[in-house]
Each structure stands twice: as structure tokens, then as C-alpha cells.
Amino acid sequence: MAKPLTDQEKRRQISIRGIVGVENVAELKKGFNRHLHFTLVKDRNVATPRDYFFALAHTVRDHLVGRWIRTQQYYYEKCPKRVYYLSLEFYMGRTLQNTMINLGLQNACDEAIYQLGLDMEELEEIEEDAGLGNGGLGRLAACFLDSMATLGLAAYGYGIRYEYGIFNQKIRDGWQIEEADDWLRHGNPWEKARPEFMLPVHFYGRVEHTEAGTKWTDTQVVLALPYDTPVPGYLNNTVNTMRLWSARAPNDFNLRDFNVGDYIQAVLDRNLAENISRVLYPNDNFFEGKELRLKQEYFVVAATLQDVIRRFKASKFDSSNSTKTAFDAFPDQVAIQLNDTHPSLAIPELMRIFVDIEKLPWSKAWEITQKTFAYTNHTVLPEALERWPVELVEKLLPRHLQIIYEINQKHLDKIAALFPKDVDRLRRMSLIEEEGGKRINMAHLCIVGSHAVNGVAKIHSDIVKTQVFKDFSELEPDKFQNKTNGITPRRWLLLCNPGLAELIAEKIGEDYVKDLSQLTKLNSFLGDDIFLREISNVKQENKLKFSQFLEKEYKVKINPSSMFDVQVKRIHEYKRQLLNCLHVVTMYNRIKKDPKKLFVPRTVIIGGKAAPGYYMAKLIIKLITSVAEVVNNDPVVGSKLKLIFLENYRVSLAEKVIPATDLSEQISTAGTEASGTGNMKFMLNGALTIGTMDGANVEMAEEAGEENLFIFGMRIEDVAALDKKGYEAKEYYEALPELKLAIDQIDKGFFSPKQPDLFKDLVNMLFYHDRFKVFADYEAYVKCQEKVSQLYMNPKAWNIMVLKNIAASGKFSSDRTIKEYARDIWNMEPSDIKISLSSDPSGGANKANGK
């Protein structure tokens, strides 16, 4: 049960969390009881904790509704340019606490729930994560929605309402087992179905060329039913919309065309159409060319573009004008951002609408299309790039294939004119790859069809320009940009680490929440011993809290005064959880060799999901759990070293582990992690980073000073040089006794005595086809880890470094990222107007910092 706050604690919780007025609390209690009674049809005698959660969620939602309606009215009145963020993933996590914070209701709700005799934290834990994403790409989309609303941009997130999100991970006998994530089982209080905006989406069929133009006919129709979720900005009364599409079979499905009397079977077959939005594909950084996935990609695109055009035509903007000239204004009113290539079919689909339906000439349609779209690239791993078989696209989307061919022809004509006789260049730059079966290179389609292409960190954008899409950036250098990723400080500081957020606010005020660059002001407190101790105390409280959580949920006991060394992210060879694992084995061997020697106690925590079909990633999990089994049960080791595999890592678990972390592991092979955003979350929450010069680590080192991160290992040039020379893993194995010992133990069954050859495939990979060169960085990594332990023994020096990192993390707010997208790509202006809640039709508004 929550304890009441003392007056001092209440004073410390400055208005970051909202003012608590008596009438405010009474109003919330009234709303809560009303919903319990009228919405849930329960009284306090029979209500369950879940009922209480839903009553609270509906009460908080009531405070969103007026602002939501008002925001949409305001956009209609003012007719600003709108941005549409298209993504197959939105990894939102939980909504309740984020909504309370952004509406300034958290303290009042806490008080109301306390007065009702309930425990706020217990209620928050009941909410299911909306796990509609795999990892970084989907979570980035969620952070971006928060920032776009906070910056007052007229923005819409468009995606799919998957019935089943990312699988729940269970560990059984050390192996990952997947379970379906039935996240909607109890209902979702935040969404509103909008059947009145249901739209048809077409598949298959054939193309007819007639006098009147081209027609796509004899198609199968699936209906797209939109569900809207409110996205509140931080204390600015703006509430934007995330619209997710659900697939529905039309009522005449399988009945109209061949009514052979099997009515029951026809109704049962409706499932086939509705499977489109059934489940999220659980691949991170890997392309799997399945027909159902292609259907998902087209489904979201086709429904969204109809909606965008409907809204454009209904807007007050130039509504007197006739269609043809009206579409000239389309790119002035609409920006569409493609989150990776997954929604790339939006390019041929918009062309199809303009040319076949709106009857625009090709050149005009293409000009508008290019001005409308922009593309974000998220990965340079070749196995992740989408390349759809022509044959599959021809079957599913015959008209789109024709349009893609036409786009390609005009594109290649242009190149041939610029580079006559350079046949190889034509082959490299074509949208169609010929070798090994014809495939469409979706990244090439996005580059050609967009006016801007961006990478997600400086180093990644450089690789995109100079290596992956070199030919394209030589052709149009101005098209290529960098937009370093960011994270929302609302969720990733205020929500998950209120103690630290309040400590910072006491020193520099509250404005940093909307302008994270103000964190540099903390540098003036580097000499303030009391402040350093307070920061350290907050970390210790978070570690204690997380230890208690681990003990309660996972039945694991850990030493809260040990260093918490954490690597949480998708399990992938390029992220090198194996390198971390080898370090754990090495520490274990050192303790065993000399148990009396001083050893800085560590709890190593590794968490993350492996794609269900990714054999090596699953074997890596089994290795981690097997090493943990040995290390954690060795009496000689005791509490000096523990290895925990954190089961079912997800957004709500990240919010618990990140504030408790001392050391953040960001150890991908240089040149493989596009940006990373977990690295930023740890930095903002007072962890130090051990990492390679990869992704955003490079810019973190630039902001904080390289001496304030633990940087080790090969740089991008070193990796290239090693590739050129030829990477021989055996050489490192022979030269480094501790590495040899660790590998031999894994190989000979020390960690799997019942199955001595359990890890032979893994060891074989490390020796003969390790693309990510684990052995090459082993020695530097272990040495760097020794430096970490050294510093940890000097708490004051450690805390100074922590404060320097927090003070340098301001650049990594997604607010900064979105301002750059708005300025450099979308041609939109953020607004600090606070929408007024009176519904006076003039769209009355005032500055957010005033009334």
C-alpha cells in the first residue's frame, strides 16, 4: 500500500507532476466512482484490481477527450501543413502514467487513488504493454509521436492494430519459448474504433488498359477499420492522433462471387482476410519475404493514403479550386515520412491514385509524389534490406508492379544520359535486381521516390552516403541528410526516474523537460558534494527497488550494492551479447583462480528477445542462461558475481531497469548499429557507457568528452582494414590465454555437462564465420572493463562522471530530432501555442508559457 507523502516530499515533487487542488482530487474521485459504476458496472464489493485500473484509465481519458476534439477543430480551422508518420511498428508500452504526466494530473491522481484506499503502483502494473514493435524502430516511432505533440505539430501516426504484438518470452530450461501476446484480451481503454471511416483495400486482380486509362479490376477487397488513440503533448493541450488499421472482411466475402451454398464455410473463411492485422512479424533487422507481410505493408499504405487524400480534399485549404490545380498544393499541405522501407509501397500507391484515379499526367504526379515523401533508413545490414520477389508483387499488386517498372525506366533513362556506356552503374542503381531471381530493391524505390533520405546518427548517415547508397548520393548529394535519433524525456526521465527528475528540477528549474539542452546547466554543480551524493542516493534507491522487483517477480536475489552492468536490447550477433558473455566467463575464471583477490562485485544483467527463427540468437540465450547456472551457484564466487537473464524484456521493464543501471553495454561491432536509443536512455538516467565507436555512441562521446565514456575496440577503419587483411579468429584464440580458456570451457561442455557439444555450432561460428569479429575486440573489452571496476571503487570520481554524462545528454531528446525533421525535411514550424479549451470557433489560442 502506498504511504502518504510528507509535506517535505510533496514540496520536492514540484509541479513537474502537476498541482494538487482539493477540487481537482474530488473531481477525479467522482469520475473514478462514476466509471466503476456506469462503465464497468461494478461496486467496491465485487470490483477487482483490474476494474480499478480501468476505472482510473477511463477517468484520465475523460481529461484527454476535450483537448483531443479541440486540437482537431483547431487544425481544421488553421489548416496547418500536416505530417504523416508511416510505420509498421509503434512500440508504445503503457499509456496511463504517460498520459497523467503529460496532462499534469499525476499528483492529483496519486492523491485521489490514495484517498480511495488503493495503490497507484499496483494499478499501473495491471496495464498491458502495447507491444506493437520489435525494438528500436518501433520505440523511436512512439517517442516521435510524443515529441510531435509536445511541439504542437499537426501530426498523425499511421500503422496496424496488430491483435497480437511482439511475443511474450518465456525461458524454459534455459531456452527461449514464445507465447502469443494477447494484449487486447481485457479491452483497451485508450482506443476508439471509427467504423465510419472504414476503407476498402484491394489485392490480386488484373490490369486493364482502356481508352479512358488504366484500371485495376477483379480484385479481392479487405476493409480497413481505423482505431484512434490519443497522443497528448506535454502540458500544451495538444492531443494528436495515432490511427491504427484493423482488417475486416466485407459482408459479402466469398458469398457474392461463387455462392455454392456453403454459407458456413464462407463465413469461417472471413478469417483469411482478417489475418492481415493478426500478428506483428517478430523480426528485428532481418527481411523475411512472406506474402502475408507484403499484404500488411500494402494494407497500411493503401488505407492511410485514402485517408490522407480524403482529409486533404475536405480541408478548408484552397477548397474552391478544381482537382487538378488543387493537387499542386498537396506537398504544401502534406508531408509523409516513411519509417524504413516497410511502407515503401506508398510511393507507387500514391502514383496509382494520382494517375489512374485523379487522372493527373505522369510527370505532374511524380513531381508531387517526390515532394511529399521522405525516407528514413534504419540499418546497413544487408540481410535486413527489403527485396521483394517480382513474381510475388505481380500476383498481389499487378498495377503497382507496372508503376514500379515505369518509375525504374525513367530513372535509368536519366542515369544512362548522365553516364553513357556505364552499364554497371545502371545495374547497381536499378530498382530491379536481376541476379538470383528478379527482386525489387525497396530502398532504391524509396530513395528515387523521396525528396529527402536520412540516416539516424552521423556515422550511420556517412555510411549510407559513402557505402550503401554511394551511387545515389553522388547523383543527388543534397537529398541525403542526417537526423540523429532521440528519446522522449517525458517517458525516459520524468516517468521512469521521478527521483532524478525532481533532483534536477530543484537545481535548474522545470523548463528542461521541454528543452533538454538546459541540462548543461548541471555542469556548475560538478563541485557540489551534496548534490553528487544526492544523485548517487537516487541511483541506490532505484537499484534497491529493482532488486526487490527481481526478487518478487523472478525469485532472484542480488546484491544491490554491486555494480549493475546491463545489456538490454534485441538478441543479435551484431550486438555482441557473446562478447559480454565471454567477459562474464573471464571474470568467473579470475575469481576461481584467486578467490582472495579484491574483486569489485558485479551483477551482469542481459535481456532481450531473439527472433523465433534465428537459431544462433536462441543459442546465445541458452549460453547466457547456462553460464548463469554455473556462476550463480558456485559458493566460491558468492555475491561477487551474478549473471541474470532478464526474461521478456519490453518497454515497461526498460522503465524499471534503466534507472537502476550503473554500466550500460553498447558494444556492437563498429559500423553495424545505425544509432541505438537505449544508449541515450541510460545516459540520461545516470549510467556510464562502455561501448565501441558506433552509432550514437560517437556523438555521446562528442557531447560528454570521450574521456567520460569507456570507449574500446576497433573503429570503423580498423574493421575495414581487418576485412581487407582477412579476419582469422584462431590467431586471437592462440594469443590470448583467458580467451582460449573461456572458449574451451564453452566448447568442452563445462557450462553444459549433460550435453557437452551443445554449443559446438556457436564455437564453430566464432572461429570460422563470425562477421562481427567478437575475438578481435575481446582483449580491449576486458581491459576496458578493468578500468570500469577501478573507477567504481572511487564513488566520488564515478559520480562526477555520471553528472557530466547527464549534463551532456540534452542533444538526445527526440524534441531536438523532430525540430530538425520539421525544419529540414517537412518544411513545418513547431508551435509553442497552448490551444485554448473553450471551443470558440476562432480557434482561440495562447502561448504555452503564458495563459
UniProtKB/Swiss-Prot annotation:
Superkingdom, natural source: Eukaryota
Broad class of enzyme this protein falls into: transferase
Keyword Cytoplasm: yes
Described purpose of this protein according to its UniProt entry: Allosteric enzyme that catalyzes the rate-limiting step in glycogen catabolism, the phosphorolytic cleavage of glycogen to produce glucose-1-phosphate, and plays a central role in maintaining cellular and organismal glucose homeostasis.
Modified residue annotations for N6-succinyllysine: 364
Residues bearing PTM N6-acetyllysine: 470, 796
PTM field: Acetylation, which is up-regulated by glucose and insulin and down-regulated by glucagon, inhibits the glycogen phosphorylase activity by promoting PPP1R3B-mediated recruitment of phosphatase PP1 and Ser-15 dephosphorylation.
Keywords: Acetylation, Allosteric enzyme, Carbohydrate metabolism, Cytoplasm, Glycogen metabolism, Glycosyltransferase, Nucleotide-binding, Phosphoprotein, Pyridoxal phosphate, Transferase
Compartments it resides in: Cytoplasm, Cytosol
Source organism per UniProt: Bos taurus
Record's subunit section: Homodimer; enzymatically active. Interacts with PPP1R3B; recruits the phosphatase PP1 which dephosphorylates and inactivates PYGL/glycogen phosphorylase.
Protein name per its UniProtKB record: Glycogen phosphorylase, liver form
Main location class: cytoplasm
Activity regulation information from UniProt: Allosterically regulated through the non-covalent binding of metabolites, being activated by AMP and inhibited by ATP, ADP, and glucose-6-phosphate. The activity is also controlled by post-translational modifications including phosphorylation and acetylation.
Originating gene: PYGL
Cofactors that this protein relies on: pyridoxal 5'-phosphate
